Amino acid sequence: MRRSVLACVLLASLLPASYAGDGAAEVRRAAQMVGQSLQAKQPGSLRKLLPDTGKVELSLQRLGPEDGAFAPPQVEALFRDFLASGSVRSYEVVRVEGECKAHGVAHARASVVDRQGSPARVGLHLTFQLEEGRWVLRGMRETAE
C-alpha cells in the first residue's frame, strides 16, 4: 500500500504544470502572454505559444488585416509587420470560458493603434489547445468593441 501511494505521489510530481494545474488559469496565463508580447513589440516571444505542428487561424482587421490559416513562423512575421507601424497600447484578459481540459477560449480587450495611426478598441477571442503539456495558440479573432 505504501509503495502504491509513493508511486502516485511520484507520478503526480512528474506531470507538467499545465496537466497538474488549473486549466482555466493556464489558459488565462497564455492569453496574458500574448498581450505582453504584443505590448512589448516582441513578436518573437510568441514562439513559445505557437504550435509545433499545424496552423493558427487568424481573423484580424486592425491588427492585420489578415484572414486565414498561418504556419507559426508566418504568425510571428505578421505580428512583426504590424508592430513595425502599429501598436497595442493596452491589453486585458476579461474572461476564460469553461474548464479548459484540452481546449480553451479566452476573451481579451485591447487598445490599439493600427498601421494608419488610427486608435481603436478591439475585442480578441483567442483559442488554445493543450499540446504536449503546454497551451498553444490555435486561433485569434478580432471583433469591434
Language-model region placement:
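Positively charged n-region of N-terminal signal peptides that target proteins for export
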Residues: M1-S4
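A short, structured loop/turn motif at beta-sheet edges
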Residues: A40, G98-G104, Q129-R134
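Surface-exposed, charged secondary-structure patches
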Residues: F70-Q116
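Short, low-complexity N-terminal intrinsically disordered segments enriched in polar/charged residues
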Residues: P16-G44, K48
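Bacterial N-terminal signal peptides
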Residues: A7-L14
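Surface-exposed patches in mature extracellular/periplasmic domains of secreted proteins
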Residues: Q42-L49, R89-R95
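Short, solvent-exposed secondary-structure junction/capping segments
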Residues: Q36, L50-P65
